[in-house]
Amino acid sequence: MGRLIDLTVGIQSPHHLIRLSKDVKEDLKVWLSFLSNFNGRSFFLEETWYSSSKLDLYTDASGALGFGAIFGSRWCYGKWPATWSYSNIAILEFYPIVLSLYLWGHVMRNRCILFFTDNESLVHVINKQSSKDKSLIFFVRKLVLICLEYNIVFKAKHIAGVKNRLADSLSRLQVQSFKQLAAAHMELPTEIPLHLQPQSWQP
């Protein structure tokens, strides 16, 4: 909404026309997608903020290898395709956060959730829901849309990487190490549908 509001700055009459930028059009597509499926009903959110530690929700990414996400006893991981050779690790860290909501967001419905990530710049992007980086904005839109669909309010907080050992082992594709550290988790990972795999998302 911020970009839409910014467009009205300096406009003196309601009949004046405004040129919509490509970014603004992409923002409008998010709202159109949500409103097309919204049934007009919503539930009051619980006042409690559910942290990553309370939900057992952790994600991580390794720039050279892959990504991992954990939610309760559920988990998933994957290897980066060659096309995801980004220098900005924040983009790689953002993907498993958004992925976790697409996979398990229905279980987090109607809650206020505090995401933990070990990337401080990503914390800033998530909390402001804005960035000058077009690739990060791509994931901001994905995050906003899925949270609208599940009536989730979210914010992020920095967590030191050393406290994120389980997701870190998955992002390094060390599955056996993960299973030794987390015996209580499901034996098999959650399958990531093709349309949610990184090669299907090109920010």
Region locations from a protein language model:
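Flexible, low-complexity interdomain linkers flanking nucleic-acid-processing modules
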Residues: 11, 27, 152, 169-203
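A short, polar/acidic, helix/strand-boundary loop motif
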Residues: 71-95, 99, 103, 120-137
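Two-metal-ion RNase H-like nuclease active-site motif
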Residues: 50-63
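RNase H catalytic domain
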Residues: 102-166
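Short acidic, Gly/Ser-rich segments with clustered Asp/Glu that frequently serve as metal-coordination loops
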Residues: 61-67, 123
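Primary recognition of RNase H-like, Mg2+-dependent phosphodiesterase/nuclease domains
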Residues: 65, 70, 77-79, 106-117, ...
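C-terminal reverse transcriptase regions that engage the nucleic-acid substrate
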Residues: 1-48
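Mobile genetic element proteins and their domesticated derivatives, centered on retroelements
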Residues: 4-5, 31, 58-60, 69, ...
